Amino acid sequence: MKKLTMESLLVYTFVMGVCFTSNLTCEQKIVLIQEQKLGAICISTCYVNGVLAGNSSCVSVRTSYLINLAMLTDGFKAMKVGNITSISEKTAFLRVIINYYFRGVMLRALIAKRLPNAAQLSSTVNCWLEGHSAGGVMTLFYGTERIVLKSSTEMNASQWTSDGPDANGTLNILNERVSLDSYFLSMICPQLSDEIYKKKVVHSKYFSLIKNDTMPKKFLRNTWKSAWTNWYKYKEIEALLDFSRDYENVSEITHSMSAAGLFFLAGGAFTMLLLLCCLSMITRKHVVKDLGYK
């Protein structure tokens, strides 16, 4: 019998581990910026079994990759929730919910609809598959308030709950069609985390759920809220919207700021040189006078 090398033993251990434990955590954070021309920035960070798998602008999340992996799950293939039964409807649902909870679209919609004065809002999606246990948790953080949805294969039904007063009526929106959130958390996301973990084991060196873009490359433009003021939950399943339209590439702004900076730097250098010349002339005049020269 051929002996196992240390490398093959490690691979075997990893593959066996895939069958028992996988954990996916992604956090999105929107921070409003007061500076002119920059409305806000959305940052997404993902971890696979505790190991960083991407950190950049929310618009850089590999949504197509996540959707394709989610389509491999049994939860997607067997999905029959509400009036979502056909492949096209289920694919539209995946596209929307992954944009909602992995690219910060839900945060943008809630800020525009219910939390216009929020300076910062964040959300976390965590789902796992461990043996026969599978489930997930979605958490929204607004100030000191935390809004949570928990769902698993052992739970029959679940609702969004808040540990605060929910003065803005956010729960009313979140609990619309909550069965779709719950199904994704319990039946699709855990298996998605397993598919992601398998890919990470095979391609550990180059694996990432988020494109390696510079964080400040994409900002939310000042007008991004206007598109979401009439929003209601999962409207995008029926209407195919471009989720990236809220973003603005600020390379031109950066270049103009750099040009302005160079202009002021050059102007400052010229002024300093002029002052030094004047000082040199005055000093030379005094030296000549002290030496008795006319």
Swiss-Prot record:
Q: What's the protein called, per UniProt?
A: Putative immediate early glycoprotein
A Gene Ontology cellular component where this protein is annotated is:
host cell membrane
Pfam families given in the database record: Herpes_UL37_2
- Stretch forming the signal peptide: 1-21
Keyword vocabulary terms for this entry:
Host membrane, Membrane, Signal, Transmembrane, Transmembrane helix
Query: Where does this one sit in the cell?
Result: Host membrane
Topology term for the membrane: Single-pass membrane protein
Q: Which residues form a coiled coil?
A: none
Superkingdom of origin organism:
Viruses
